[in-house]
Amino acid sequence: MNSIHGHYHIQLSNYSAGENLQSATLTEGVIGAHRVKVETALSHSNLQKKLSATIKHNQSGRSMLDRKLTSDGKANQRSSFTFSMIMYRMIHFVLSTRVPAVRESVANYGGNINFKFAQTKGAFLHKIIKHSDTASGVCEALCAHWIRSHAQGQSLFDQLYVGGRKGKFQIDTLYSIKQLQIDGCKADVDQDEVTLDWFKKNGISERMIERHCLLRPVDVTGTTESEGLDQLLNAILDTHGIGYGYKKIHLSGQMSAHAIAAYVNEKSGVTFFDPNFGEFHFSDKEKFRKWFTNSFWDNSMYHYPLGVGQRFRVLTFDSKEV
């Protein structure tokens, strides 16, 4: 069975369920070029205990929400337990091992960590793992909310956490992030279009430039595997003579895809957000370019073709608040 959700690809095989289940085999959980192969033979009783513990972990426990319902009466989204949630937890764990290396490298290139955040671990993972459409990650929705918050002169993390500190979640923001991801995962729906519609409702618009006497959105695509990072970084750092711009960046490879975001300002530098690592700031574009090229690309594992190291798409946005 092949399944692709969010930015992870998982292949599950040789799994059968029933009262006489004696073994379970998980094969080829792929993240980046790291192929995680876990083959486990379990007795019936041991398997029951492990699955029961996993189900309980996903369906119970302290809520860590500031209130049970959103301000308009909606409950935090969740779906029935699925076996893929176990695999997603494993993949998130692999990604989370890269967090220290990425964060430690920021200062070495003259950058600062604005906020430590990772969807791959901790309380936030515990919230998104409870729904089949968000269990693999909510990078697209997080980037969209980050751009909106920054354009409003606010911090996504002040809106996501009570008091802006990790602990309790603001359920309205958590619900909004999860719902945008869920809406983009529906059948026969283009996730990019869903995000664009959400942006329009929140005062964010695609930047338009004139080409051949027509106004067209700034939409740059290319490859990283054969052409290196110069084309990608040029697209991220180009402000088209305006001096600033919001960037939503899609990275993809043979089996995975991921979204990151940035605010580029010719005067104040680059503020960069990756849902897997947090928010960082570099005082000028050259510092960011060197960090991204010499450190981040490899430390994040994004350089592998099996992961997200083949293609990119960079969209530029404007906001009336800027």
UniProtKB/Swiss-Prot annotation:
Keyword tags: Hydrolase, Plasmid, Protease, Secreted, Thiol protease, Virulence
UniProt-listed Gene3D superfamilies: 3.90.70.20
One biological process term in Gene Ontology: proteolysis
Enzyme class (EC, first level): hydrolase
Active-site residues per Swiss-Prot or TrEMBL entry: C139, H258, D274
SUPFAM superfamilies named among the record's database cross-references: Cysteine proteinases
EC number(s) recorded for this UniProt protein: 3.4.22.-
Disulphides: none
GO cellular component: extracellular region
Entries under Pfam families matching the protein: Peptidase_C58 (PF03543)
Subcellular locations according to the entry: Secreted
Domain of life of the source: Bacteria
Role: Cysteine protease, which is translocated into infected cells and plays a central role in pathogenesis by cleaving the C-terminus end of the human small GTPase RhoA/ARHA, a regulator of cytoskeleton. Once cleaved, ARHA loses its lipid modification, and is released from the cell membrane, leading to the subsequent disruption of actin cytoskeleton of the host cell.
Subunit architecture: Interacts with human ARHA.
Listed NCBIfam families: yopT_cys_prot
Family affiliation: Belongs to the peptidase C58 family.
Protein name (Swiss-Prot/TrEMBL): Cysteine protease YopT
Species this protein is from: Yersinia pseudotuberculosis serotype I (strain IP32953)
The encoding gene: yopT
